[in-house]
């Protein structure tokens, strides 16, 4: 029996009576057949009254927990009122558009399982504030001064033009209504937007200001609602149509005359191939490396020592990655990754200078956009001019030397030595110090090939 009694008490306490129930009961069975009052909720700590703008349910509609029952407008915002339990909206006591104090009965709600036909509706008892307001019948007679009849006529005609009257009051208007105890504030002519009653309308009604002031302000505001652009003319352009092609052609000519900035920085070194010729001749007898393998090995060794393949990252991108905390990717170098390739155009030629000069050098993929490596041949001629000057000097001193005729008549062909000129072009991403180290190392490799091939 005790267990059954506790179960019934819990069931009774869980019934739908949490929405502003005026009186609570404690029974051993569920309370059915009795509806409860739904009062105006306080949506903020400082809220004293509010306006009902919309009911989302009609009388007799059932609602569930979490549904929006109505919308309440306060002096700060318009907020939705949600229900906590399931139920039925039995009756709406106050429709929308009325200024209602907090705690006043606005509707009657019933349990979701109740039958509205057999339901006993509670009587709407007036609150203490309403009773005190209705009991005081003393009215403060406003001090009305004589005004011009013209302003009164304009004020009445303006109020008649407002077809859609907004019955919700602003806090300042509600304060004046309670201060001067105006019983029927809707009879006051409203000059606000959409028929809203303003503070000036109430002050004009009680005689604090001229009755024609609200109507004159209303006309002034309505004149500013629609902007008149009839007297506005578009601004004329500062240039004519004939001058536009001239400006375009002048700009094109200026672009043509401005020289393009060279993006590459060039380094040159002169290379002698005498030792390389003799080395290749010995290697050919032993059936060892060919020209392609030897030149590729020397270029790869210079790349590895100078670390030219380490492309510097973009300063802006690296700074952005540093701000985001992302790791900065650095390219690593190794001999296997940077082994270049030599692609000759003519494999049958026996001229070493021409063979290397006309060959294409395939650099690694990460250097192809930043580095250009070329070889060009330069012919140097050496004659006997120095030796001839020495002979003239001997003749002037009277030293023992060959006769002048024998010196002049002796004719020797000038000797020619052909060297290679190494040209390296780099962009800003490549370090200049590494580029200088590369060309110097490559020059040393060509002029001392035995030292390089001993490590390969």
Swiss-Prot record:
Residues 35-110 form the Lipoyl-binding domain. Residues 123-161 are annotated as: Disordered. This is Probable pyruvate dehydrogenase protein X component, mitochondrial. InterPro entries: 2-oxoA_DH_lipoyl-BS, Biotin_lipoyl, E2/Pdx1, E3-bd_dom_sf, PSBD, Single_hybrid_motif. Its main location: mitochondrion. The modification N6-lipoyllysine is found at residue 76. GO terms for cellular component: mitochondrial matrix; mitochondrion; pyruvate dehydrogenase complex. Required for anchoring dihydrolipoamide dehydrogenase (E3) to the dihydrolipoamide transacetylase (E2) core of the pyruvate dehydrogenase complexes of eukaryotes. This specific binding is essential for a functional PDH complex. The keyword Mitochondrion applies. It is found in: Mitochondrion matrix. The keyword Transit peptide applies. GO terms for biological process: aerobic respiration; pyruvate decarboxylation to acetyl-CoA. Residues 136-157 have a biased composition (Basic and acidic residues). GO terms for molecular function: dihydrolipoyllysine-residue acetyltransferase activity; structural molecule activity. Keywords: Lipoyl, Mitochondrion, Transit peptide. Belongs to the 2-oxoacid dehydrogenase family.
């Amino acid at each position: 029996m005790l267990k059954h009694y506790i179960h019934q008490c819990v069931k009774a306490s869980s019934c739908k009576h949490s929405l502003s129930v005026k009186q609570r009961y404690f029974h051993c069975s569920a309370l059915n057949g009795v509806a409860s009052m739904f009062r105006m909720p306080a949506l903020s700590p400082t809220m004293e009254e509010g306006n009902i703008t919309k009911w989302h349910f009609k009388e007799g509609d059932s609602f569930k927990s979490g549904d929006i029952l109505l919308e309440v407008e306060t002096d700060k915002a318009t907020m939705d009122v949600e229900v906590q339990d399931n139920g039925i909206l039995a009756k709406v006591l106050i429709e929308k558009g009325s200024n209602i104090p907090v705690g006043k009965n606005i509707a009657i709600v019933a349990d979701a399982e109740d039958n509205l036909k057999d339901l006993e509706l509670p009587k709407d008892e007036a609150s203490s504030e309403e009773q005190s307001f209705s009991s005081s019948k003393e009215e403060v007679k406003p001090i009305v001064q004589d005004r011009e009849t013209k302003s009164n006529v304009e004020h009445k005609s303006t109020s008649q033009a407002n077809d859609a009257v907004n019955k919700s009051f602003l806090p300042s208007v509600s304060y004046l209504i309670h201060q001067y105890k105006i019983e029927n504030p809707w009879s006051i002519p409203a000059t606000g937007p959409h028929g809203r009653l303003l503070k000036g309308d109430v002050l004009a009604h009680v005689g604090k200001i001229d009755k024609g002031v609200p109507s004159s302000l209303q006309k002034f505001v309505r004149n500013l609602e629609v902007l008149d652009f009839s007297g506005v003319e578009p601004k004329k352009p500062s240039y004519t149509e004939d001058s536009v092609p001239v400006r375009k052609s002048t700009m094109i000519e200026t672009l043509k005359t401005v020289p393009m900035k060279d993006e590459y920085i060039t380094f040159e070194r002169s290379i002698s191939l005498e030792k390389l010729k003799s080395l290749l001749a010995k290697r050919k007898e032993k059936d060892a490396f060919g020209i392609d393998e030897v030149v590729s090995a020397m270029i790869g060794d210079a790349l590895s020592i100078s670390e030219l393949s380490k492309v510097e990252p973009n300063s802006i991108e690296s700074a952005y990655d540093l701000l985001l905390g992302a790791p900065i990717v650095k390219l690593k170098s190794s001999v296997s990754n940077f082994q270049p390739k030599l692609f000759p155009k003519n494999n049958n030629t026996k001229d070493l200078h021409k063979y290397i000069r006309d060959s294409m050098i395939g650099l690694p993929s990460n250097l192809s956009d930043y580095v250009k490596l070329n070889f060009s041949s330069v012919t140097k001629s050496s004659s006997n001019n120095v030796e001839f000057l020495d002979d003239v000097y001997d003749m002037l001193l009277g030293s023992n030397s060959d006769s002048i005729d024998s010196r002049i008549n002796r004719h020797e062909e000038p000797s020619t030595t052909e060297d290679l000129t190494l040209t390296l072009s780099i962009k800003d991403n490549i370090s200049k110090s590494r580029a200088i180290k590369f060309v110097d190392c490559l020059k040393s490799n060509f002029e001392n090939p035995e030292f390089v091939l001993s490590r390969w």
